[in-house]
């Protein structure tokens, strides 16, 4: 995890998917009923194939424009939710399958739960919150400013997917976009590799050295 920041918590503005039709839910979220298990598996395979195809496509020209529009709608930097000192570790309720929703990529961990940054209490019953863990292996050197940029992008993406189904697929879309954003920060020179990292494998490409071409002597 980035040593300069705590886990970032954002309100989840996504739609919850019920597991049992007769269960009651009082949160202000739309409800969707799942298909049978076989259809779930087929849909998951299809979604993974679609995600792989999307990641291989070049970014659309209007991507930067949409990003600027999301930042315009957001007033000021993203702020984390307040800490809950009395939070306890709880499993997700049975109506949602009793297992957490999460997205795990190389530098991003997203959980549909509340995680106390001090006690590490993992409350999965608070599905109206998303917790972001940034760079848990410390592959990059982070500052407060660069961490805040990732948090702002995370909040913008959550707002962008408002109303979408709260599922692992949606969280993977957010996580994939954040990975691309981190790569952009690296290529722009805003972050750099942590040469003291426990695992040094340059997952986003080998370091680039900038030099002044005018200082290269002519070969005669």
UniProtKB/Swiss-Prot annotation:
A GO cellular-component term linked to this record: chloroplast thylakoid membrane
Membrane association type: Peripheral membrane protein
Superkingdom, taxonomy of origin: Eukaryota
Record's compositionally biased regions (Low complexity): 34-44
Region ranges (Disordered): 20-91
Full protein name: NAD(P)H-quinone oxidoreductase subunit M, chloroplastic
EC number: 7.1.1.-
